[in-house]
Swiss-Prot record:
CDD domains: NAD_bind_Shikimate_DH (cd01065). Belongs to the shikimate dehydrogenase family. NADP(+) binds at residues 128-132, 211, 233. GO terms for molecular function: NADP binding; shikimate 3-dehydrogenase (NADP+) activity. It comes from the Bacteria. It catalyses: shikimate + NADP(+) = 3-dehydroshikimate + NADPH + H(+). Homodimer. Keywords: Amino-acid biosynthesis, Aromatic amino acid biosynthesis, NADP, Oxidoreductase. Shikimate binds at residues 16-18, 65, 90, 105, 213. This is Shikimate dehydrogenase (NADP(+)). GO terms for biological process: amino acid biosynthetic process; aromatic amino acid family biosynthetic process; chorismate biosynthetic process; shikimate metabolic process.
């Protein structure tokens, strides 16, 4: 049986559960796919050229995580779907010798909220302005939520302004129903915002959501302490991964089937 290689680019990357859940799917569906896929973590130096690495490794597809999603958008031969709007790519697929970029974060995040029966008619504050934040802002706006973005610097905020989001470099004196940590602070065991400011937001919120997964982050720990409903990024990971797997399988395996397999192993 033919072997195809896949992977996930990131820095850091050793924490990623993507290899676990994707390899479970490749093993489960190898008969339907007609090939055996192997998916591995790829630690990418910050200065690396993503497209060169992809081709050099002979990959058929890959996911992209921190901090490369915006750079991945720039190196694709083609961009499809909502990735065109959010200028962020988390899924790369080699199609007819062209590197095609997709974004499954936006829909993956929405499906994870829907899974928790979260209501759409509310407002959200996104902390951070990177590739994940862009995808979430696009996705949430499509679902009718009012989106605000708080970032420590002006870098990247012009995108959100063009999108119609309220943008801040200092914490706004407003209340938000959904507080999303889309920064990398949790990977460094830090809060994304001053603790007292974050407490104030949490006390007025209905859900605290951290894109990090696999451990109780300082962000989620504070929400738990204040008895605020909270959620980590596990469901989003599995939903976006199952949507990516559908792309890797050339739509032979619906994301719903991939989701069930991935959920069973993580």
């Amino acid at each position: 049986m033919k072997l195809k290689s896949f992977g996930v680019f990131g820095n850091p990357i050793k924490h990623s559960k993507s290899p676990l859940i994707h390899n479970a799917c490749f093993l489960t569906f190898q008969k339907e796919l007609g090939f055996l896929g192997h998916y591995h973590p790829i630690l990418l130096p910050l200065e690396s050229r993503i497209k060169n690495e992809f081709l050099h490794l002979g990959l058929s597809g890959a996911n992209v995580t921190l901090p490369f999603k915006e750079r991945a958008f720039q190196i694709c031969d083609k961009i499809k779907g909502i990735a065109l709007e959010c200028a962020s790519v988390n899924t790369l697929v080699l199609e007819n010798d062209e590197l095609v970029g997709y974004n499954t974060d936006a829909l993956g995040f929405y499906l994870s909220l829907k899974h928790q029966n979260y209501q759409n008619d509310q407002n959200a504050l996104i902390l951070g302005a990177g590739g994940s934040a862009k995808a979430l802002a696009c996705g949430l706006q499509k679902q009718g939520l009012k989106v605000s973005v708080l970032n420590r610097s002006a870098r990247g905020l012009d995108f959100f302004q063009r999108l119609g989001c309220d943008c801040f470099m200092e914490p706004p004196k407003s209340a938000f129903d959904l507080i999303i940590n889309a920064t990398s602070a949790s990977l460094h065991n830090e809060l994304p915002l001053n603790k007292e400011v974050l407490k104030g937001y949490f006390k007025e919120s209905k859900l605290a959501y951290d894109l990090a997964y696999g451990f109780l982050t300082p962000f989620l720990s504070l929400a738990k302490e204040l008895k605020i409903p909270f959620q980590d990024g596990k469901d989003m990971l599995i939903y976006q991964a199952s949507l990516s797997f559908e792309k890797f399988s050339d739509s032979q395996i619906p994301y719903s089937k991939a989701f069930e397999v991935m959920r069973s192993v993580f």
